[in-house]
Amino acid sequence: MGDGDSPMCLSAVSFKGIRCWLDKLLLWALTISITLQNAAVDCTRVENNELPSPNLNSSMNVVRMGQNVSLSCSTKNTSVDITYSLFWGTKYLESKRRRGGAVDFHLRISNANESGPYKCKVNVSNLMKYSQDFNFTMAKDESCPSCRLSLLLPGLLLGILVIVLVLAYLIHLKYKKGKKTQREDQSKGSGDAPAQDELYVNACKTQTEQPQEIHYATPVFKEMAPMEEEGGTDGKADYIYSELTH
């Protein structure tokens, strides 16, 4: 009896196996059919310029400076290859390519200006669509010493630079004034020199001139005869004349 039941058991097992295999085949065919239908719908939308706009969001809206954040760009079109591009204002940041779904962009907020706005662009063939703007909110943390230091450091450097420039200007002005005084002193000294030279030349000329010849006179005394004066007087006057001979 056992031998008689064996074919029936084998046939039942083989029937279940075939049925399981057929179920898997049917499920696989159904999945392929749905995928092809979705792809056809997406391609039809693309051909009809019906590319949906992407959505840009983040898991956190309030951030601090120096914090790492992520932005997710997603679209309803999931069956075609899509190029996702991220923009900060009008500045291009990064691009990623995948078949539909969503992509994540990782950023680091270094200053308050990097809070936004951000945009995501999807590109399929010759079609493109932009997402809405997204902005982060900067948290006001008063207990952040590094933040205060980053704000004070530029002002401190600017103050040091101004002091250095003022000192350099004063030193240059003092040096220029001293140089001008030295030039004036030199010009005065050069102005007195010709007068001294002239006096020296005159003195030399006076000393080098030939001395004048000195002539000596020798007196010669002669006795002259007395002369009578008119009017008649008895007195006689004797006169002695002399001549100088050189």
Curated annotation (Swiss-Prot):
Disulfide bonding pattern of the chain: 73-120
Bilayer topology: Single-pass type I membrane protein
KO phenotype (gene knockout): Enhanced IgE-mediated, mast cell-dependent passive systemic anaphylaxis. No effect on differentiation of hematopoietic cells, including mast cells.
Any one Gene Ontology cellular component term annotated for this protein: plasma membrane
Chain positions with Phosphotyrosine modification: 216, 241
Cytoplasmic side: 172-246
Post-translational modification: N-glycosylated.
Domain Ig-like C2-type: 52-131
Extracellular compartment segments: 34-150
UniProtKB keywords: Cell membrane, Disulfide bond, Glycoprotein, Immunoglobulin domain, Membrane, Phosphoprotein, Secreted, Signal, Transmembrane, Transmembrane helix
Keyword rRNA-binding assigned: no
Name the record gives this protein: Allergin-1
